[in-house]
Every structure is written in C-alpha cells, then in structure tokens.
C-alpha cells in the first residue's frame, strides 16, 4: 500500500464525514422549522401517519445499510 493511496482514502473519509455532518445539521434545522410551524398553527406535534411513513422508509434503507439507517433515525429523534 502506498502512502498516497492511504492519504487519498483518508481524505475521502474526511470529506464524507463533513458531508454527513452538514446533512444532519440541515435535517435538524428543517425538523425545528416543522416543530415551530406546527406549534404556530396549533397542529399536534406527533403525526402517527407520517411517523409510520418515515419508519417504513428507514426500514427499506436499512436493508442495504444494516443498522446505519436506524442509527441515523434514532440520532435525529434524540436531537430534534
């Protein structure tokens, strides 16, 4: 293995980590906007139909990524 190959892969991981972090921050911001909109309009915070849709989507994503999709969903729930 060449040092340049290792550096290239590490750089790719660093870029991926930055992208993941930015995407999660964007998702969190959108979630806060939804929470505020629901509060403003007097809409209950929990929509069981939407939550079921989200769970189904993450279950489908988990088929290809193992527990990663569920870990992301759980993180999003804890940090909303």
What are these regions (language model features)?
Residues 1-80:
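Domain-level signature for soluble enzymes in the chorismate/prephenate branch of the shikimate pathway
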């Amino acid at each position: 293995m060449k040092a340049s190959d290792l550096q290239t892969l590490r750089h790719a991981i660093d870029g991926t980590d930055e992208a993941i972090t930015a995407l999660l921050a964007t998702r969190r911001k959108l979630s806060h906007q939804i929470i505020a909109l629901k509060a403003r309009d007097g809409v209950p915070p929990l929509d069981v139909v939407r939550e079921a849709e989200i769970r189904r989507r993450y279950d489908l994503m988990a088929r290809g990524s193992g527990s990663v999709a569920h870990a992301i969903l759980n993180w999003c729930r804890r940090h909303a």
